[in-house]
Amino acid sequence: QLIRASIEKPVYKEKLRLRAYGTPELSDNVFVEIKKKYDGIVNKRRTSMTLQEAYDFLDDDICPDNHEGRINRQVLKKIDYFKNFYHLQPKVYLSYDRFAYFEKDDGDFRITFDKNITTRREDVRLEHGSYGKKLLPDGKYLMEVKISGAVPLWFTKIISGLNVYPVSFSKYGTEYKQYVLTNYTSLMYKGENICLNQSLHQHQRIQSALASQC
C-alpha cells in the first residue's frame, strides 16, 4: 500500500526502514527509521538499537531495553504506531555502495553516488549480507544532490555545462515496478492489488532503452 501510493508522486509520503551500515551481526547497532517526504522536503526520525532488538520490536512488539539511554522513546512510539496502523511486514532488502562528498565551506551541501544497488524479496534479513538482483545495469551510478537550501552557483554551472538535469528516481519504487513487470501474470492470478499506471509503462520503456544501449 505504501509503495503503491509513493509511486503516484503524492505531496506527502512515508516509509519505514531498518537501516545498517555494512553487514551487521545481531549484536551490532542499527537504526529503525521513519522517512517522510512532504512537498520535496525530507524528514527522518530514527532511533538506534541492536539488530536483534530491532527484529524483536518489529516482529513481536517487544520493546528494547533502554538502560544505556540510547533509544529515543518518542520516536519509538511513532514507529510502533506507524507499523501497527499499516500492519507492516518486511518485504524488500536493498543495499548499495555509496560515495559521499561534502562542500568544504558548506557541510549542508552533499553529493552522493550509489552503485551496486541490489535488491531481493526473499531472505530479507540484514545479517545475511548483500546479494540479489541488480537494480541498474553494470557501470551505472545514481547521483543525488542533498541540500536544504539553494544549490551553489558553481555546481549549477557545472551540471548545466554537462547537460545534466534532475529526474525523479526512487530505489524502492523502481524495485516495485520491476517486480510487477516481471511477475504481472502471477500477481493478477493471485488477485493482488497492483499499480500499473502511466509511470510504470514509462519505466518499462526507459529500462528497455537502457538495456539496448549496454
Predicted segments — roles?
Residues 1-214:
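Phosphate-end processing signature that detects enzymes handling 5′-triphosphorylated RNA
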